[in-house]
Amino acid sequence: MVEKNKSPYTTITGCTFLFYEFQRILPLLTDANSESLLKDEIENNRVLQVNSIASRKRFVVEFKRRYAAVPAHFWQTWQNMSEAGQRAGLFYAILKTYKLVFDFHFNVTMKKWNSIDHTLLKDDLLMELNELSAHDAFVDSWSDMTKHKCCSTYLTILRQSGLLDEKTNELTAIKLDASEFAYYIRSGEEWFMEACLLYPYEINDIKTQL
């Protein structure tokens, strides 16, 4: 088994977007007794509504990582957003959590968006994984099945965050009220607005409204 600890990458096969599940568990993540509440949730399935205990364990690990990837006050802002804003915000946390998602997004998706062809397919992502494999022994050690699953998971994340059309696989920008982008601008995270596939003139327009 190739050593993972030197690689910045992890597989993303264990947990997809899971918007509603994350929404339900957020109060447990923010609670002062978070650890004991999450342990109880894994055992008793009070809020997650996920039948398998193995899945609950896996999801809780990933939800904790996503929660910790951004400042705690972000989640206070998040709770007051529209559903579309919350979906975008969860995608922001996912980008901050998983380097593979970040690289897929900036090396493949955004290049596609800035080209003539806005269709994003699994093959586009597999090409990026091949590039990563050439420079990262841990990624290179993944089975073809794992690589395919990572690509499928990323595409699911895009669809559920509002960036990829379910039927056509066409990329689509996330358009929100200016107020829902305020956190990113005021926190020096304007790059995320580019990740939402907004053009510079759209970003400037949003800034003038704040």
Residue ranges, per PLM feature:
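Eukaryotic partner-binding/assembly regions in large regulatory complexes
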Residues: 1-88
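Leucine-rich, amphipathic alpha-helical/linker segments
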Residues: 8-15, 19, 25-28, 32, ...
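Non-catalytic, well-ordered alpha-helical scaffold segments
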Residues: 19, 23, 57, 61, ...
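Positively charged, polyanion-binding regions of nucleic-acid-associated proteins
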Residues: 89-92, 96-119
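Long, low-complexity intrinsically disordered regions
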Residues: 109, 113, 133-139
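DNA-recognition alpha helix
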Residues: 121-137
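Accessory, usually C-terminal, subdomains that scaffold auxiliary metal cofactors
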Residues: 140-210
